[in-house]
């Protein structure tokens, strides 16, 4: 059977949307016991994870990676990521090892493969051999083209696509062992890998198709038919008073999945049908014809898509009732409620479904200890035990491809956490190539001649990762969150447990709180609920650990601030009275965390209530159990005694907080 190809044209009659109303109800359920799901991969122990990680990325041989060698190699890994070099498997080290990343080994700041391989020409060809079912081919083509442009914008390299024959860079998707001796590992973990420039497999780039490939912000679903043909689903969307985060068949009697292409379907009425095998197939040789169920394959009748007869795990179906006779087939779309992992081969969720006697009409984490959202792929999990993980934000194909193509140009991994070539995946909404990346690639190929001739885009310096002891940094926010002190500057953070110790970092904010904008104005922790509250512009975000609370961000007005307050300077929860203080300009407000509203009698002037505290603050923090509050502005801070409100110290942030 031929390899996965681009989707064919969609055929089949247009079916009108027939709204029947919401009939589903969710049964409230007590907390479920933790169970073992069939087909679930057991998580590795910390030691198993460390040995595999250090073997793969730092060359520690599995058979001789004993405690002594392990400790030394761990220190190398910790140094690479800016972690305390303890040589121990502490929590921060394990957290870093469990993050999704590239499959190539690590080195240091922009670096090159051994012997610095590079292309000996500037005209580079690429060919897309296969596609992921997660995105339509046009979106995949565009993501790869934009990823190559990241590098052509700053070098003389020019990339052109060919559709036949051998290209310099062959691009494909695969699962587990996929023919190059470097297997992938299922969902999450290793995302992709690429080979250094050269002949044969040189430059080839492979992407793990057990991942959910998106543009970084959830499923990208292009609808067919309806009254919004070719537009994209809007998730979540509102229908009959309920929000939907994926395609649904609610309101239909034919089982076809649909979505709204605007948030409010009831207001706008814009919709289309989501990819589904009953509407169309892609690739294959059936020119987009829908599946025909049941169909016969090798003498067996199939009532749904299958992976039988294939070694790559892709779901397919016959488009006539007898594949053995007609040899007509197509691949089943996997962008509409398709599951990832589990034991259902990508089959879609079925709602409602029964689990341990309770009904669920949406994805749930019930029964799991890792908090991952899942669903059943039949109406009754208890009977059938068929399930899969629900789609999440997925991984940006553009960002991962831009990183891998950096390897295909000759760059290794960078130790700079702000660089595209850093090994750990972090979604960045408004991506810009960093100075570290530009310096590395231009050392190999030089600068783009278009810039010198004035025919290219106006050059702009890429962002530089700040160094807290070498620069005078004014922090955007400082807060104690879950017992650690965090310093925020643009898209970076530094963290420490104790003041005066040099903070660990820089790290990317998006690694911990991915939905935040690239720059915040203020942050504090509400200790009563252990939730972190972030402010940026006229909005605020609330997180439980790294999970954004539903419905956020919200406008500052919903917190009780007046409409003319378009940003805040600082905020902190005061241990003296458990109230939260919000500062903007020369005023401050007091918020009651218990009653969830502003206290009356505010705002007040900072100068009238706080001894020696200036206006336009940068940050405020009250360290737990310390009895003092700290007010930051510019390069200095004021330390106030909480009971007397007396200023007891004026000091330097660098020397007293950053260990410089």
Curated annotation (Swiss-Prot):
Q: What induces it?
A: Aspirin appears to inhibit expression.
**Quick one: which residues bind Ca(2+) 2?**
168, 200, 202, 204
Tissue expression per record: Produced by normal skin fibroblasts. PEX is expressed in a number of tumors including gliomas, breast and prostate.
Q: Which residues form a coiled coil?
A: none
**What does the activity regulation annotation say?**
Inhibited by histatin-3 1/24 (histatin-5).
| Impact upon substituting residue 644 to I | In a colorectal cancer sample; somatic mutation
Q: Which effect does the record note for changing residue 228 to T?
A: In a colorectal cancer sample; somatic mutation
Pinpoint the residue ranges of every Hemopexin repeat in the record: 472-516, 517-563, 565-613, 614-660
Q: What PROSITE patterns is this protein classified in?
A: CYSTEINE_SWITCH, FN2_1, FN2_2, HEMOPEXIN, HEMOPEXIN_2, ZINC_PROTEASE
Q: Which residues form the signal peptide?
A: 1-29
List the ranges annotated as motif Cysteine switch. 100-107
Catalytic activity, per the record?
Cleavage of gelatin type I and collagen types IV, V, VII, X. Cleaves the collagen-like sequence Pro-Gln-Gly-|-Ile-Ala-Gly-Gln
Report the outcome of residue 498 to M: In a colorectal cancer sample; somatic mutation
Q: How is the cofactor bound?
A: Binds 4 Ca(2+) ions per subunit.
Quote the disease note of the record.
Multicentric osteolysis, nodulosis, and arthropathy: An autosomal recessive syndrome characterized by severe multicentric osteolysis with predominant involvement of the hands and feet. Additional features include coarse face, corneal opacities, patches of thickened, hyperpigmented skin, hypertrichosis and gum hypertrophy.
Role: Ubiquitinous metalloproteinase that is involved in diverse functions such as remodeling of the vasculature, angiogenesis, tissue repair, tumor invasion, inflammation, and atherosclerotic plaque rupture. As well as degrading extracellular matrix proteins, can also act on several nonmatrix proteins such as big endothelial 1 and beta-type CGRP promoting vasoconstriction. Also cleaves KISS at a Gly-|-Leu bond. Appears to have a role in myocardial cell death pathways. Contributes to myocardial oxidative stress by regulating the activity of GSK3beta. Cleaves GSK3beta in vitro. PEX, the C-terminal non-catalytic fragment of MMP2, possesses anti-angiogenic and anti-tumor properties and inhibits cell migration and cell adhesion to FGF2 and vitronectin. Ligand for integrinv/beta3 on the surface of blood vessels.
Quaternary data: Interacts (via the C-terminal hemopexin-like domains-containing region) with the integrin alpha-V/beta-3; the interaction promotes vascular invasion in angiogenic vessels and melamoma cells. Interacts (via the C-terminal PEX domain) with TIMP2 (via the C-terminal); the interaction inhibits the degradation activity. Interacts with GSK3B.
Q: Which family does it belong to?
A: Belongs to the peptidase M10A family.
Q: What is this protein called?
A: 72 kDa type IV collagenase
Which organism's genome codes for this protein?
Answer: Homo sapiens (Human)
The coding gene here is MMP2
């Amino acid at each position: 059977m031929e390899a996965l190809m681009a989707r064919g044209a969609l055929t089949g009659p247009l079916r009108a949307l027939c709204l029947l109303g919401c009939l589903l109800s969710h049964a409230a359920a007590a907390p479920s016991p933790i169970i073992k799901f069939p087909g679930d991969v057991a998580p590795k122990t910390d030691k198993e994870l460390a040995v595999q990680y250090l073997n793969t990325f730092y060359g520690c041989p599995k058979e001789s990676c004993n405690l002594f060698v392990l400790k030394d190699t761990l220190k190398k890994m910790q140094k690479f990521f800016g972690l305390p070099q303890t040589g121990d498997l502490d929590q921060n080290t394990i957290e870093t090892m469990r993050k999704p990343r590239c499959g190539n080994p690590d080195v240091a700041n922009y670096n090159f493969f051994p012997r610095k391989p590079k292309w000996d020409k500037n005209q580079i060809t690429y060919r897309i051999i296969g596609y992921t079912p997660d995105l339509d081919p046009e979106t995949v083509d565009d993501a790869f083209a934009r990823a190559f442009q990241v590098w052509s914008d700053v070098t003389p390299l020019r990339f052109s696509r060919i559709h036949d024959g051998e290209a310099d860079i062959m691009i494909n998707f695969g699962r587990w062992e996929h023919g190059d001796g470097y297997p992938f590992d299922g969902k999450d973990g290793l995302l992709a890998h690429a080979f250094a420039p050269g002949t044969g497999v040189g430059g080839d780039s492979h992407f793990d198709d057990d991942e959910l490939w998106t543009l970084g912000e959830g499923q990208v679903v292009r609808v067919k038919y309806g009254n919004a043909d070719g537009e994209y689903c809007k998730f979540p969307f509102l229908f009959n008073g309920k929000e939907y985060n994926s395609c649904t068949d609610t309101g239909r009697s034919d089982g076809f999945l649909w979505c709204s292409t605007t948030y409010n379907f009831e207001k706008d009425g814009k919709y289309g049908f989501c990819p589904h095998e009953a509407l169309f197939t892609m690739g294959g040789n059936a020119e987009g014809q829908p599946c025909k169920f049941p169909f016969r394959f090798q003498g067996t009748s199939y009532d749904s898509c299958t992976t039988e007869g294939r070694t790559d795990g892709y779901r397919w179906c016959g488009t006539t009732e007898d594949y053995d006779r007609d040899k007509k087939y197509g691949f089943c779309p996997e962008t509409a409620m398709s599951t990832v992992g589990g034991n259902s081969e990508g089959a879609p969720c079925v709602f409602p479904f029964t689990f341990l006697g309770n009904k669920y009409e949406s994805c749930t984490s019930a029964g799991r200890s890792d908090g991952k959202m899942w669903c059943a792929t039949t109406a009754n999990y208890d009977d059938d035990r068929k399930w899969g993980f629900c789609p999440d934000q997925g991984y940006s194909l553009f960002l991962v491809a831009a990183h891998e193509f950096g390897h295909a140009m000759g760059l290794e991994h960078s130790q700079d956490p702000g660089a595209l070539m850093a090994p750990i995946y972090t979604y960045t909404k408004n991506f810009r190539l960093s100075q570290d990346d530009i310096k590395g690639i231009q050392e190999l190929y030089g600068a783009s001649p278009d810039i010198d001739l004035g025919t290219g885009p106006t050059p702009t310096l890429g962002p530089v990762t700040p160094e807290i002891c070498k620069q005078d940094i004014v922090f955007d926010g400082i807060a104690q969150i879950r017992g650690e002190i965090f310093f925020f500057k643009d898209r970076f953070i530094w963290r420490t447990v104790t003041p005066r110790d040099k903070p660990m970092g820089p790290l990317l904010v998006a690694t911990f709180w991915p939905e935040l904008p690239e720059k915040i104005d203020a942050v504090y922790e509400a200790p009563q609920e252990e939730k972190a509250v972030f402010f940026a512009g006229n909005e605020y975000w609330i997180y439980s650990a790294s999970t954004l609370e539903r419905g956020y961000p919200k406008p500052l007005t919903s917190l009780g601030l007046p409409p003319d307050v378009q940003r805040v300077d600082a905020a902190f929860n005061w241990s003296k009275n458990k109230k939260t203080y919000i500062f903007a300009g020369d005023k401050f407000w007091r918020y009651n965390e218990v009653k969830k509203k502003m206290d009356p009698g505010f705002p007040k002037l900072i100068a009238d209530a706080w001894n020696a505290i200036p206006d336009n603050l940068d940050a405020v923090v009250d360290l737990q159990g310390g009895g003092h509050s700290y007010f930051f502005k510019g390069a200095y801070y004021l330390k106030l005694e909480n009971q007397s409100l007396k200023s007891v110290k004026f000091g330097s942030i660098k020397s007293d907080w950053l260990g410089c």
